[in-house]
Amino acid sequence: MTENKKRSFATETIHAGAIKDTYGSLGLPIYQTSTFIFENAEQGGRRFALEEEGFIYSRLGNPTNDALEKKLAVLEGAEAAVSTSSGMGAITSSIWPFIKAGDHILACATLYGCTFAFLNEIKKFNIDVEFIDMTDLEEVKAHLKENTRIVYLETPANPTLDIIDIEEVVKLAKKNSKDTMVIADNTFATPYLQNPLKLGVDIVVHSATKYLNGHGDVIAGFSCGSKELMTQVRLVGQKDFTGSVLSAHDAFLIFRGMKTLEVRMKQHVANTKKVVEALQKHKNVEKVYYPGLEDFKNHEVAKKQMKDYGAMVTFEVKGGIEAGRCVMNNVKLCSLAVSLGDAETLIEHPATMTHSTYTEEALKEAGIAPGLIRLSVGLEDADEIIEDLNQALDLI
């Protein structure tokens, strides 16, 4: 391979960010330290003044975390990335530095429950926050204001899988004001399936707990974008506001997990398509929601901006919430648990679990029905996942 040739996604998941260790270690070294020694007082001064690159204190940067951040930046097509100790750490660290009292935030109505709760909490600081249906571009246009500082979106959205036209929302936001930033949560898609930065988004956030790590054993997050914005996220959002710093050991685990991201995502998606087909055929399933279905709202948008349609599926069963509980209480292979993107298939009830922070009215506005079930399709044999779901559905 020539030096200037761009490497494939699969190759970068393995090699991007790799450190040439003093001892020749193939694996990423874990720098388990809180602080770093300066050669002299002058060097310490230069590093604090940002006149010299180097490490100071692990809350501000660590070589293990740095390697991980470089890997994600390459995969997302970003100049830089910041790792955090949770997805909410990434989201809050990416919002706090850029807002002040009197600003307006426009967010999609269907969001991860804790993101929704956070955006409601900051209203007490005189931040005007509005939640709208961003799948409707006319709604976006109508609600943008002169003081709109941030447009915040998830696509596919949690849990309804709503697809928002990233490129068109960015155009509207930038036309509204050069000071309007667009932040996109790319957790459900991962950089393998979607790259919001290439569509004009300013900052992309992730819960790395999910597909990026992929093994259900770490809580972590990422923010990525330009070097200028990531400096603000790290040195203001993370350092001064949230203190949400990822441990070096967890950074090592995610670095290792990300090496198989493409392989895992291919299998997740392949399994999901089989599960979707089976759910559509079951007599006790009322409706299946999946961006890959041709009758799914904004299917064409998903087709345009995503490489494939992801590994999350939601469905409603006949009989409402009690029937849904019957299904969840009777699965044997699937695990009744929140989170997603694990090797295991996870099933949960958004209205009473992940989105319990939503009021009844907000649930209705977000399109989260009382009987909606969310399924994160894992890496087990697809036929065995289907068999388990069918036997539980048969009990309704």
Predicted feature descriptions by range:
Residues 2-62, 70:
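N-terminal "arm"/small-domain region of PLP-dependent enzymes with the aminotransferase-like
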Residues 273-342, 358-364:
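Conserved small-domain helix->loop->beta segment predominantly found in fold-type I
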Residues 40-89, 114-121:
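Conserved N-terminal alpha-helix of the aminotransferase class I/II PLP-enzyme fold
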